Design a protein with these regions (language model features):
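Conserved histidines in hydrophobic membrane contexts and catalytic metal-binding motifs
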Residues: 1-233
Length: 233
C-alpha cells in the first residue's frame, strides 16, 4: 500500500516537474538577469543628457488671454526650438507669446527636443512618425502619434517624442529589450507584458507550490527514518 502511494506521488511530482520545468527555468534566468543588471543602464541613463536644464522664458502672455472653449485645468510649458509653448489641459499646444495654437510637431522640432535629452555626440540615422503600435511594442501604452528617432549605434538605440504634447517620452536600446522580454517571461503576461496579476502566473505559482509540497511528501514516504520519527512523536 505504501509503495503504491509512493509511486503515485512520485509520478505526480515527475509530471508536474516536467510541466513546470520550462517556466521555472525562465523564472531563474530572468531573476538572475534582473539581479545582475543596473536599472539605470536599462533605463538608458548612459545615453541621456543628465545635465540638461530647461530654458527659462520671459514676456509670456497670460494663459487667460488664450481663446479656448474649456476652462484651464492644467498647464505646462514646453520648449520647442527655443520658443515657449503652453500645453493646456493635456490636449493642446499654444504659443506662449502669440496665443496661436500649434497643430503639428515637425520632424526638426522633434529632433530638437530629443537632442536636449540625449547625450551629445550621437548621430541620427533616421526619424519616422508612428501612429499605432502593437501590445508588445517597446513604445506601448504611451502617447501617440509620436516620432521615433533612430541613432547610429550597435545598441539599436531609439528615442521617442510624442507629437501632441511635444514631450520626450523614452529611450530604448538592446539591453532594455532583453529586460522587457525576460520581464514578460517572469510575469507570464504574454498579452501585454506589464500585468503582474495574470491568471497564468497565479496558476503556475500554485502548481509550483504543489510541486514543492509533493517533493517533500515524496521524501517523507520514501524515508523510513522520517516516518518512524514522526510516528514516535
Amino acid at each position: 500500500m505504501k509503495r503504491k502511494v509512493s509511486l503515485k506521488i512520485r509520478k505526480a511530482h515527475r509530471y508536474l516537474g516536467i510541466f513546470l520545468g520550462i517556466q521555472f527555468l525562465f523564472w531563474t534566468i530572468s531573476g538572475f538577469y534582473f539581479s545582475w543588471t543596473n536599472l539605470d543602464e536599462i533605463h538608458g541613463d548612459h545615453y541621456k543628457n543628465l545635465e540638461y536644464e530647461p530654458l527659462s522664458f520671459e514676456n509670456l502672455i497670460s494663459p487667460s488671454l488664450i481663446k479656448i472653449k474649456e476652462s484651464i485645468n492644467s498647464l505646462e510649458i514646453r520648449d520647442i526650438n527655443k520658443k515657449p509653448y503652453y500645453f493646456i489641459n493635456k490636449k493642446w499646444l499654444y504659443s506662449a507669446r502669440s496665443g496661436v495654437r500649434k497643430n503639428e510637431l515637425t520632424k526638426n522640432e522633434a529632433l530638437y527636443i530629443a537632442d536636449k535629452y540625449m547625450k551629445k555626440g550621437l548621430e541620427v540615422k533616421s526619424i519616422e512618425k508612428i501612429t499605432e503600435v502593437g501590445k508588445h511594442h517597446e513604445y506601448r501604452k504611451k502617447l501617440l502619434p509620436a516620432y521615433v528617432i533612430s541613432y547610429k549605434s550597435d545598441d539599436n538605440l531609439k528615442a521617442y517624442v510624442s507629437i501632441s504634447d511635444a514631450k520626450f517620452q523614452s529611450v530604448r536600446h538592446r539591453s532594455w529589450r532583453w529586460f522587457d522580454f525576460l520581464w514578460m517571461t517572469h510575469t507570464m503576461d504574454y498579452e501585454g507584458r506589464d500585468n503582474f496579476n495574470t491568471i497564468t502566473l497565479r496558476a503556475f505559482s500554485l502548481l509550483g507550490l504543489i510541486t514543492v509540497l509533493s517533493g517533500f511528501t515524496l521524501a517523507f514516504v520514501t524515508t523510513p527514518k522520517l516516518m518512524r520519527f514522526f510516528k514516535k512523536n
